[in-house]
Amino acid sequence: MSAREVNFDGLPGLTHHYAGLSFGNEASARHQHQVSNPKLAALQGLKKMKTLADLGYAQGVIPPHERPNIEALRQLGFSGSDAQVLAQAAKQAPKLLSAVSSASAMWVANAATVSPSVDSRDGRVHLTVANLNNKYHRSIEAPTTAALLRAIFRDDEHFSVHDALPQVALFGDEGAANHNRFSNGYGEPGVQLFVYGCAQAGGIRPLHYPARQTREASEAVARLNQLDAARTLYAQQDPVVIDAGVFHNDVIAVSNQQTLFCHQRAFLNQPQLMARLAQKVPGFNLIEVPDERVSVADAVATYLFNSQLLSKDNGKMLLILPEEARRHAGVWRWLTEMVAGDGTIDELKVLDLRESMCNGGGPACLRLRVVLNAQQQAAVNPAVMMNETLYATLCGWVERHYRDRLSQADLADPQLLSEGREALDELTKLLDLGHVYRFQQ
């Protein structure tokens, strides 16, 4: 059966701010304590979604989470009214307040790992929510992520949304950001590649930054998603590039259908892995960027590989890049030479995602790829699918509710909490989500 890839982008939330919460993410650390613009972040995200929809790609939206997360603060011993909880946290533990106020759920490449029905034993689309165990501010996302995904993929005949793995380091799981799928056509059986940073059994690990994904987690996700072991591969990301700021594999590699676009140093034992992929994937097409042309540091600084690789009607592919890639002379020179070479990628499109990029999230971070056939796409909650009307509606919603300036000091303002709840309550009606947030229950 024919199928297509549908991109679901995370919408930046009302508390988008720069707190430097993500050790190992160099952009996050570099912009710590700068003043953010949540309204601009959301509008940039919506413009990205609208751009893809206008190009003919199926595009959906995943709503933000409620932040600050008052229940998380109560679990950590703060008490009283919501305003009192915020005041106590701001005075006693401002870093915790920042963590429970993070808008990091916008990077939905970390929301779940998705496997299409053609690869799953029961013929359903499987989505396993990521536990994001390595960072506290992200580990609290899983329950709301599961609720949102079940409100979008709500037909159990077609979809199976699995809860996150146990919240322990052994099963550290970062979702689709460490997962690639290869196939001749979207509707044909594929080969799934899970990328991990470390394994309990041993082997080398990064020395400076944490390896967020474990092999044990990847294997568990493959089991939950009911994958064929013969069509499932596991590969370790090179620990040296993790220490260089490649905290997820999607910062150093991106795939689409039979094509893998990656850096020469993305994987441990890379030549052997490429040979295995060539054996497993008919027509495997490797676009490997040499280290001598683009260093790992420049790849991280520009998010060259944290891009979206999209199939076109002419059989070629379009690469969606952040503005930072165009501003780097060496990276842009390599890209323009590649396109001029009449290879697989014949078009580049640059988007301004500055607000997200300053926190270390590029085009690929903001989207969750879901391969759907026609029946499955018809079963998706239609209210979340991007079109002219929804774009105008959501832009108006952002203009009404979002602040255009936010510092860490603002997180203690009870009015910000009220503004967020009012906005999300309205959004659940606009997107026909039901009562997915705790404050609504």
Swiss-Prot record:
GO biological process: arginine catabolic process to glutamate; arginine catabolic process to succinate
Matching Pfam families: AstB
InterPro entries: AstB_sf (IPR037031), SuccinylArg_d-Hdrlase_AstB (IPR007079)
A molecular function (GO) term: N-succinylarginine dihydrolase activity
EC top class, as a word: hydrolase
EC identifiers of the protein: 3.5.3.23
Domain of life: Bacteria
Record: active site: 174, 248, 365 (nucleophile)
This protein's pathway: Amino-acid degradation; L-arginine degradation via AST pathway; L-glutamate and succinate from L-arginine: step 2/5
Binding site for substrate: 19-28, 110, 137-138, 212, 250, 359
Reactions catalysed, as given in the entry: N(2)-succinyl-L-arginine + 2 H2O + 2 H(+) = N(2)-succinyl-L-ornithine + 2 NH4(+) + CO2
Keywords: Arginine metabolism, Hydrolase
Nucleotide-binding listed as a keyword: no
Keyword Hydrolase among record annotations: yes
Role summary: Catalyzes the hydrolysis of N(2)-succinylarginine into N(2)-succinylornithine, ammonia and CO(2).
Subunit structure: Homodimer.
Protein family per UniProt: Belongs to the succinylarginine dihydrolase family.
UniProt name for this protein: N-succinylarginine dihydrolase
Originating organism: Erwinia tasmaniensis (strain DSM 17950 / CFBP 7177 / CIP 109463 / NCPPB 4357 / Et1/99)
Name of the gene this protein is made from: astB
